[in-house]
Amino acid sequence: MNQPSPAIPFELAGPRRVVFGPGTVHQAGALAAGLGRRALVVTGGNPSRASVLLEHLRAAGVEAKVFAVPGEPTIELIRAAAAAAKAHSSDLIIGFGGGSALDTAKAVAALVTNGGDPLDYMESFGRRQPLMRSSLPVIAIPTTAGTGSEVTRNAVIGSPEHGAKASMRS
């Protein structure tokens, strides 16, 4: 008779709130309005897919600026997205798309409040500095399944200069 494996203790830190189900994107405007008034919406390579989200944000009084992520996030792309968020005076970041859009959103939310460069906070090839301030609020709306980016604090970012990817924990 097989003996059950002993329980291995662990701790799981997840998102504060998960809203799940068909059509829940229709709640995004009201949810966003409770967190901020000026959102940077980070999308995948086809920003028109976010049109329903943008309609709900407008209806809820949230001013949105769209930043499209054409592929996997890189250090340069994160810098550009953070600059767009600052120029828009964003107080909320919304990721809408696959893992690349969601990872970009999380990294931008951390950079806007902490300042500096993505390399300051990157593991492996970065300076590994801790983030000292809380990130801007983030709403993650996955449109694909697979990465689980919506339930982690990690943002995986590539650096062509280093020939590698590393995490930035928001």
Task: State where each predicted segment sits.
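N-terminal loops that bind phosphate or other acidic moieties
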Residues: 87, 108, 126
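ATP/NTP phosphate-donor binding region
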Residues: 1-92
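A glycine/threonine-rich phosphate-anchoring loop and its flanking beta-alpha core
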Residues: 113-170
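Fold-independent oxyanion-binding glycine-rich loops
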Residues: 22-23, 43-45, 96-98, 141-144, ...
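Hydrophobic/aromatic beta-strand patches that form the interior of the parallel beta-sheet core
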Residues: 65, 94, 137-141
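Short, hinge-like loop/turn segments at secondary-structure boundaries
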Residues: 58-59, 82-85, 111-113, 155-158
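Glycine/serine-rich anion-binding loops at beta->alpha junctions
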Residues: 90-108, 143-149
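Short Gly/Thr/Asp-enriched flexible loops that form oxyanion-binding sites at enzyme active sites
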Residues: 53, 82, 101-114, 151-152
